Amino acid sequence: KTLLLTLVVVTILCLDLGYTTKCYITPDVKSETCPDGENICYTKTWCDVWCGSRGRRVDLGCAATCPIVKPGVNINCCSTDNCNPFPKRS
């Protein structure tokens, strides 16, 4: 019985029991729990016509895989809770 109990405890500790990642999400830039299967946080930045005066556009969110982006769009992906804060303007 002790061996069986030990195996059950080890199994529970080794399994990811429904853990979901938390990421910052735009437009509110608040931390939210990602949907099941989306364990990647991303920060996507790009320039639009107002880039010179307003700075780069920023999109924050969750994804199942790191999004593929077009030329001129920067993407940073990470996989820990709230690892995608709104970038500081330089």
From Swiss-Prot:
InterPro entries: Snake_3FTx, Snake_toxin-like_sf, Snake_toxin_con_site, Toxin_cobra-type
Keyword Transmembrane in record: no
A molecular function (GO) term: ion channel regulator activity
Record-linked Gene3D superfamilies: CD59
Stored SUPFAM superfamilies: Snake toxin-like (SSF57302)
PROSITE patterns associated with the record: SNAKE_TOXIN
Stored Pfam families: Toxin_cobra-type
Organism, scientific name: Ophiophagus hannah (King cobra)
Function noted in UniProt: Binds with high affinity to muscular (alpha-1/CHRNA1) and neuronal (alpha-7/CHRNA7) nicotinic acetylcholine receptor (nAChR) and inhibits acetylcholine from binding to the receptor, thereby impairing neuromuscular and neuronal transmission.
Signal sequence, start to end: 1-20
Homology family: Belongs to the three-finger toxin family. Long-chain subfamily. Type II alpha-neurotoxin sub-subfamily.
Top-rank taxon, per record: Eukaryota
This protein's name: Long neurotoxin OH-34
Keyword NADP: no
Tissue: Expressed by the venom gland.
Gene Ontology cellular-component terms listed: extracellular region
Disulphide bond pairs: C23-C41, C34-C62, C47-C51, C66-C77, C78-C83
Principal location listed in the UniProt entry: secreted
Compartments, as annotated in UniProt: Secreted
Keyword vocabulary terms for this entry: Acetylcholine receptor inhibiting toxin, Disulfide bond, Ion channel impairing toxin, Neurotoxin, Postsynaptic neurotoxin, Secreted, Signal, Toxin
